[in-house]
Amino acid sequence: KEGYIVNLSTGCKYECYKLGDNDYCLRECKQQYGKGAGGYCYAFGCWCTHLYEQAVVWPLPKKTCT
């Protein structure tokens, strides 16, 4: 599974500005989804890869970014 890492309290994606390989996104993806996750900056949001199937990613149902 892949997807944008999401802030569960705000419903917003984690923003990034350095597209492609991005240490911040990689670190955040691993922190939220585990050591096996990968991450990079895509379309100014942190995109996480190699997630477990039940991982919660953006957009959150019934919660828009505030």
Curated annotation (Swiss-Prot):
Keywords: Amidation, Disulfide bond, Ion channel impairing toxin, Neurotoxin, Secreted, Toxin, Voltage-gated sodium channel impairing toxin
Domain-related comment: Has the structural arrangement of an alpha-helix connected to antiparallel beta-sheets by disulfide bonds (CS-alpha/beta).
Task performed by this protein: Beta toxins bind voltage-independently at site-4 of sodium channels (Nav) and shift the voltage of activation toward more negative potentials thereby affecting sodium channel activation and promoting spontaneous and repetitive firing.
Modified residues (Threonine amide): T66
Disulfide feature: C12-C65, C16-C41, C25-C46, C29-C48
Compartments where found: Secreted
GO molecular function, one term: toxin activity
Chain ranges of the LCN-type CS-alpha/beta domain: 1-66
Family the entry assigns: Belongs to the long (4 C-C) scorpion toxin superfamily. Sodium channel inhibitor family. Beta subfamily.
Tissues where the protein occurs: Expressed by the venom gland.
Coiled coil residues, start to end: none
SMART domains the UniProt entry points to: Knot1
BP GO terms, sorted: defense response
Protein name: Beta-toxin Cll1m
Keyword Disulfide bond included in the entry's annotation: yes
